[in-house]
Amino acid sequence: MVEPARKKQRIDRDTHHTVAEPVTEAKNTLYVSQLNEKINMQRLRVNLFLLFATFGEVLKVSMNFKKQRGQAFITMRTIDQASLAQISLNGERFFGKPLKVEFSKSETKTL
């Protein structure tokens, strides 16, 4: 289970006071990079869907090869499913290249 976001402490360089800054909260969207760019985009999208569906319900696979070659965003139904997929697939080989799977830093728009 993912814990709720907490505040992380840091020291302000100018005032030397402790400042609370938010810790990034895990989301149900994963950022996948290091995808093999030689594979057809439709084939890659279908295979990413099937791979991530092993860990739960995939709501969306977003890819934009014009702007972000070799990258995709995978939206899972729950944070727990996304977490399981991230832990299980990070570093695994996919079409000959090791996947880099991280939680997306931007908000997901799909519900």
From Swiss-Prot:
Keyword Nucleus found: yes
Any one GO CC term of the record: U2-type prespliceosome
Gene3D superfamilies on file: 3.30.70.330
SMART domains the record matches: RRM
CDD domains: RRM1_U1A_like
GO molecular function: U2 snRNA binding
Domain (RRM): residue spans on this chain: 28-106
PROSITE patterns: RRM
Keywords: mRNA processing, mRNA splicing, Nucleus, Ribonucleoprotein, RNA-binding
Keyword GTP-binding part of the UniProt annotation: no
Annotated InterPro entries: Nucleotide-bd_a/b_plait_sf, RBD_domain_sf, RRM_dom
Single Gene Ontology BP annotation: U2-type prespliceosome assembly
Subcellular location, principal: nucleus
Subcellular location: Nucleus
Function in brief: Involved in pre-mRNA splicing. This protein is associated with snRNP U2. It binds stem loop IV of U2 snRNA.
Extra remark: Present with 504 molecules/cell in log phase SD medium.
Assembly with partners or alone: Belongs to the CWC complex (or CEF1-associated complex), a spliceosome sub-complex reminiscent of a late-stage spliceosome composed of the U2, U5 and U6 snRNAs and at least BUD13, BUD31, BRR2, CDC40, CEF1, CLF1, CUS1, CWC2, CWC15, CWC21, CWC22, CWC23, CWC24, CWC25, CWC27, ECM2, HSH155, IST3, ISY1, LEA1, MSL1, NTC20, PRP8, PRP9, PRP11, PRP19, PRP21, PRP22, PRP45, PRP46, SLU7, SMB1, SMD1, SMD2, SMD3, SMX2, SMX3, SNT309, SNU114, SPP2, SYF1, SYF2, RSE1 and YJU2. Interacts with RDS3. Interacts with LEA1.
Protein name (database record): U2 small nuclear ribonucleoprotein B''
Record organism: Saccharomyces cerevisiae (strain ATCC 204508 / S288c) (Baker's yeast)
